[in-house]
Amino acid sequence: MINDIISDSLTRIRNAGMRKLETTKLLHSKVIEALVGIFQAKGYIESFNVIEEDKKKFINVVLKYDEKGKSVINELKRISKPGRRVYKGKDEIKRFKNGYGTIVVSTSHGVLANDEAYKAGVGGEILCTIW
């Protein structure tokens, strides 16, 4: 049984990138779907789609690589964990890695990237960082 579906999904993406796999399959939830939607919008993955197998939903993620065959994801890190939640205000999530990275924040407006959360003027729980 998986206790933390977000950590599991991030680990599956990270491991697939290290093994240079074209796709990986994640367990479905609304938060994971929003998370990979942000990854796609920011250019860290090619695409994703929701599939259903035996009455269970999964998210199929197509990974993205550069011209040398290296994954475009340098680091994918879970910040807030079930045992230690991390919350930040809007002023503390403005930039990450001088604008090259992205912080994914769970806010009252949904799951947002750090720049979108800053524009909306909301803070929240820091789910993960990616660059």
Swiss-Prot record:
Keywords: Ribonucleoprotein, Ribosomal protein, RNA-binding, rRNA-binding
Gene3D superfamilies per record: 3.30.1370.30, 3.30.1490.10
Stretches of the chain forming a coiled coil according to its record: none
Pfam families: Ribosomal_S8
Example GO biological process: translation
Domain of life: Bacteria
Subunit structure: Part of the 30S ribosomal subunit. Contacts proteins S5 and S12.
Purpose of the protein: One of the primary rRNA binding proteins, it binds directly to 16S rRNA central domain where it helps coordinate assembly of the platform of the 30S subunit.
Similarity remark: Belongs to the universal ribosomal protein uS8 family.
This protein's name: Small ribosomal subunit protein uS8
Species this protein is from: Campylobacter jejuni (strain RM1221)
